[in-house]
Amino acid sequence: MIENWPKKPEGSQWTDDQWKAVVANGRDILVAAAAGSGKTAVLVERIIKKIINEENPVDVDRLLVVTFTNAAAQEMKNRIGEALEKVLIDEPGSQHIRKQLSLLNKASISTIHSFCLQVIRGYYYMLDVDPRFRIANQTENELLKEEVLDDILEEEYGIEDNTIFFELVDRYTSDRSDDDLQRMILALHTESRAHPNPEKWLDKLVEAYDVEGKTIEDLVYASYLLEDVKFQLETAEQHIRKATELAMLPDGPAPRVETLQADLALLGTLSSAARESWTSVYEAMQNVSWQTLKRIKKSDYNEDVVKQVDSLRNKAKDEVKKLQEELFSRKPESFLRDFQDMHPVLEKLVQLVKVFTERFQAMKRDKGMVDFTDLEHFCLQILSEQSEEGEMKPSAVALQYRNKFAEVLVDEYQDTNFVQESIIKFVTKDSESEGNLFMVGDVKQSIYRFRLAEPGLFLGKYKRFTQEGLGGGMKIDLAKNFRSRHEVLAGTNFIFKQIMGEEVGEIDYDADAELKLGASYPEGEDVAAELLCIQQTEEEVIDGEEGAEVEKAQLEARLMAQRIKAMVDSGYEVYDRKTDSMRPVQYRDFVILLRSMPWAPQIMEELKLQGIPVYADLATGYFEATEVNIMMNVFRVIDNPMQDIPLAAVLRSPIVGLNDEELATLRAHGKKGSFYEVMSSFLKGAPLEEEKELHDKLEWFYNLLQGWREFARQQSLSDLIWKVYGETGYYDFVGGLPAGKQRQANLRVLYDRARQYEATSFRGLFRFLRFIERILERGDDMGTARALGEQEDVVRIMTIHKSKGLEFPVVFVAGLGRRFNTQDLMKRFLLHKDFGFGSQFIDPRKRIKYTTLSQLAIKRKMKMELIAEEMRVLYVALTRAKEKLILIGTVKDATKEMEKWLDAREHSEWLLPDHIRAGASCYLDWIAPSLYRHRDSEILLELGQGSVPDEIYGYDTSWKVEVVDGNTLLAPEPVQEEKQELLEALREKKAVPLESERKEEVYDRLMWKYGYEEATSHRAKQSVTEIKRNYQSEEGSDNAFIKKLRAPIRTRPRFMEKKGLTYAERGTAVHAVMQHVDLKKPITEEVIREQIAGMVNKELLTFEQAEEIAIEKVISFFDSDLGKRVLAAKSVEREVPFTMMLAAEEAYQDWQGQSGESILVQGVIDCMIEEEDGITLIDFKTDTIEGKFPGGFDQAKPILEERYKVQLSLYAKALEKSLQHPVKEKCLYFFDGNHVIKVEE
């Protein structure tokens, strides 16, 4: 009992809570260990105390210690061993300690999968499994699944009168393939295996759709959605209450108050109905009627306040409108009919899943292999049996393990799943109040839901257990952080006290959850946490969203490079615990954390340009590496030489070494047939004198190829690979190239991959190539081979997930403005552990589809879980920092975002309103509103404190909040002052104060003039848009751009400029619609509106862009003479990309270089039509005309024609070169005013 626990020794460094976690026993114990709280040390100490307990010592092999990774298990064993050896020094005669050291290697300190394997190896005879089984390779597993599924579906297609199956196919597949159906079966199989009883979970999924005799109130989906209805109505009420407060201000629109009170009454009626039943809300929603606002004389009131009041009211109305449209536009009974109709189809789908699972298990059994989920389920099968009631209960084997283990200790408990929880439950005592289960973790760091981890298991116990442990389990909070400075902890607390709550975030960030200072640091300079929000540049992003992402990555990388270089150069100091002193920061002290790695290559490139050593363990790029790509093509040719593209790639590669002319010469010897056939034919004849060198190269390769093909039929794949490396000399060749060691390492990895493949159930070169194709199809490309150790003095770039458990003196968290990945919410079908299956209702006969109740509920639930998971990911990122935390994010429009974020100032509670937190689309949407309520926020100092209470406004944390103009980051930093004089002298070709024996040589080299200097000030690759700009620019070329880089000018961001969508964004949206208009359908408002909705669903347009599309203007084009010609044209091509070579003097007006220089020009032609008498080129424009030119279109026409003349001339030239046909007409079409300009040369 509690009073019998050993007292903490005098002078002990353990905190009271840590000591309690070390010695408490007699019940199940849950330790909520915050980041940096020393949980591993506590866990080791608890184990040691149990082993050396004088009254009741426990052998180490009577403890089951479950860790999250094999590395953690090994570290745990090492720590226990070291601790036991220290005890042995004090007690050299202790046989008990010696025994423990000998037992340690056999102790059950491992991952859950290793424990499962141990159980299965011991009791394999209870299963239908070969004891010599091996663990399946992931890709091998996927190939087997594909094989099994193909066989099952082929059988189903062959069954006559298989009505329900074909209805399933019609509803959930496209005309081209049944890939979607296959994905559904595999997803259901995977999700079911995350439950202790997969079949039972699948059966419940079908039962949920059996609504015979039920009302909508009986459905779990409806009850959950009603909670969401209450949430949204409460949000609407908050908007109206705030509007009322503003209206009652001295300069507020007081006449609005009466209407707002009526609004509150209406919302109150709806909220009351929501507390009753779905039917009540439905009926209330049919009677919603908003009062019309009374007209007021706006000059009598503060115009800004009036706008705010009206805006808040509109937001409230939009909340209700959204509910009406999504949930209450249909009668309750129509939702029930959806379930009735879908029930037999879903039943068939689940039957297919069960058949698949059975066949897949049988195939793995035949091949003597198991996967990781099999390990869990086989173990559970051994440890459990079925009771008379059909429930799972512990088996005789489980009871043996219960008797064996004195205690079961689980590390990282927050990442346990349902199956693992069941395994643990069966080997521990059955009573929480008298249990022997010790769990350690931090639910705030549970970030593996995508691996089916279930944080709800931790949360359930945390809510159920008490600190005293009376009548149940005990919970212990370890909140003291021994890792970080006060500034890091206080900054993290300040943010999470405002954003993490039970309703949104799944856990209250209360006093128990807050991080408390446990580490001592010397005074440091510049240790305040920072938020740097970058305003994206105003340059038009030609490449769309992808281009915008590239620019964001570049801007953030440039800013981080500048900061890292400045901190290193200035001697910024960090604390070194080993020497107990401050020391200058090193590159190894920095880490850049990202949510995912797509930006990593760009950040690495930018840091390298600044001379900063950097390392990232990239998970992609291996198969794109040149040397690997060439070798894969060699193997494709060995497998099947009739493939032209791989063969041409090999012939052109350094292995054979043909140039373009030689390749063309070979092709000219046989215009028909494959390259291989032409090569064979060419080698049979006697070569011409000028073709002898080509003949020798090809003969050498041809003979090698025949030998390799014969070798591949008889020998192993790995031997073949090494034979190719040796006989071509390619392995040695790449070793002599730049980054040669890296390239050779990549080729060795390919060899190792082949050896791993041959250890599977598959054999042969063809299967290996298919194996690699599957890896690439699944997006499982590997990173290039590691050629740099992680202990080097380099800046590290890693994902937040990879950083878990690590710590760094200086942490940059970048990409905070990137949107959360919500792709899972957009899938055609959704799966949830509690709510089962949800998809649209699809009627292929009527060709209609619409959202179902189950889909809405699951989507909402998954979104809230995603929000909670992203909060936890952010918590992990912020708590990696020891001394300095720098947060960086980029936004398109800082002014617009600030208007949204500053809403937080109007709330007086610590926890921000649910709708602000749940409505976040990126991390900045949480961080910025939180910091804009603190005194250190400059914008708050400008605009005032608002409703923020002093407790929040003056919270004891130090922040630097800054908005950085992206334009200033495009220019390099000024040259260091001490080098300026020398550089100026060199630039002016003056003598420099430096004596040298090679003075004359140095002088001659410095005086040397590059022969192609003119070309260095012009880009070798241009877009048509840039060339057009150059012609319009006073400076005439992008030479000005390069000059600007030499003289950086820093300007203040234009915060106060209010913007919606930019002209470029509007233009992009209109072009996207014109590209996708179905010309075979009648061009009506309904058709265009349906098309735009489809584009939004496919994420080709954003909602904001869709709202900006003037549909009537699109229709006007097709009603015009030019539009009718498009509809009647022989052929129509839209968004036609092109690349062509252009003389430099044609691209640059100021070109003074050598004639004959060319540049590469690329562009995209909006539309080209082919008519009987030739080709017409059309370019769509969204320029504003009406109201901009006093003289109307007559004044605008010559200006616009001159503006776009060069652009259309280049488009026409590109078409004429590629099609070998003249362009008869070049037209500009302006949507503003429905104007056409025919551009003449």
From Swiss-Prot:
ATP binds at residues 33-40. SUPFAM superfamilies: P-loop containing nucleoside triphosphate hydrolases, Restriction endonuclease-like. Residues 505-805 form the UvrD-like helicase C-terminal domain. PROSITE patterns: UVRD_HELICASE_ATP_BIND, UVRD_HELICASE_CTER. Residues 12-485 form the UvrD-like helicase ATP-binding domain. Disulfide bonds: none annotated. GO terms for molecular function: 3'-5' DNA helicase activity; 3'-5' exonuclease activity; ATP binding; ATP hydrolysis activity; double-stranded DNA binding. Keywords: ATP-binding, DNA damage, DNA repair, DNA-binding, Exonuclease, Helicase, Hydrolase, Isomerase, Nuclease, Nucleotide-binding. It catalyses: Couples ATP hydrolysis with the unwinding of duplex DNA by translocating in the 3'-5' direction; ATP + H2O = ADP + phosphate + H(+). Its EC number is 3.1.-.-, 5.6.2.4. Belongs to the helicase family. AddA subfamily. The heterodimer acts as both an ATP-dependent DNA helicase and an ATP-dependent, dual-direction single-stranded exonuclease. Recognizes the chi site generating a DNA molecule suitable for the initiation of homologous recombination. The AddA nuclease domain is required for chi fragment generation; this subunit has the helicase and 3' -> 5' nuclease activities. Heterodimer of AddA and AddB/RexB. This is ATP-dependent helicase/nuclease subunit A. It comes from Bacillus cereus (strain AH187).
